[in-house]
Amino acid sequence: MTTFPGTRVLLVEDEGTIAMLIEEMLEDLECTVVASVAQLAKAIHVAGVVDVDLAMLDVNLAGEYVFPVARILRARHIPFLFSTGYGGSGLPEAFRGCPVLHKPFAEKDLRLKIALTLES
């Protein structure tokens, strides 16, 4: 099984239970969750200063889109992937080529998307 020892992750997810499940999956994959953020304003701030190898972004944070965070991460050359329960068709043109995890997902799906994201 592929794992990602020492990979530092920023998790942006507004549903507490889902965030905890994702954190567990990331830990099983030997990643370190450096920050877990639920609100867009805080995520925007954290994205500008956090030292991570990868970010996982829930597309919809309590009715607000996470795309400002994605723009900051892209400008900082930090790879990211989106997670959503709405499908990838709602992504703006600028992010259509980004990896997307469709909720609900299994650990094997997360492993595959992390590998894909880190390779790109």
Walk through the language-model features, giving the residues of each.
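Two-component/phosphorelay signaling modules centered on CheY-like receiver
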Residues: 16-35
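Acidic, metal-coordinating helix/loop segments flanking the phosphotransfer/catalytic sites
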Residues: 36-54
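Active-site residues of response regulator receiver
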Residues: 58
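The feature encodes the CheY-like receiver
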Residues: 62
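Hydrophobic/aromatic residues positioned on beta-strands within the core alpha/beta folds
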Residues: 81-83
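A Lys-centered signature of the CheY-like receiver
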Residues: 103
